[in-house]
Amino acid sequence: DMTGVTGAVIAEVDEKFQPVKGTEQFIECDTIGIAVGLTPDIALPSMADVTFVNAGRLGSQVPMHDRNMETTKEGIYVAGDSSGVEEASSAIEEGKLAGIAAAEALGKVDAKAAKEAKAQVWDSLNQLRTGPFGAGRHDAKEKIIEEMEEWKVKNNAC
C-alpha cells in the first residue's frame, strides 16, 4: 500500500462542523476521498451585498433567501453551495427552483405554470431532505425562509 492509509476516524459534527466527543468510529479503508464542499461558496452573493444569516447545519453564513431562492436583493437568486452545503441532488433542484422563479419574474413563464413547476421541485427537495441528516437540513432551510419573511416585513419588501 503506497498511500499509508489504513483507516479513518469519523465522527458526528456540531453546527460549527466540530467533532462531537464520544461519537468517533474507526473504519478500515485504504483510500479517503472528499466529494462535497464543507463550507458555502458565498463569493458571488457577497459581491451583491445580500443579507446573510447563520444556517448552522448548512455551513455557517449563507444568503438569506425566500422559497423561490431570491435573496434580499431583488432579482438575485442563490442555489446549491451558495445557499448552503447539502448534496448535488439538492443543488440541482434548487437551481431549477431559482430558474423557474427568475423566468416567472421576467415574464417568461406564466404564474400558473410556474406555481405547478415549483411545487414539483419542492416535493423533490422535501423528499431529499428526510432521514437523520436530511431532516436537519430541512429545518435549517425552513429557518432561513422564515427569517427572510420577517426581513421582508421589517423592510417593507414584498
Task: Describe each region flagged by the PLM.
Residues D1-C158:
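Residues forming the flavin
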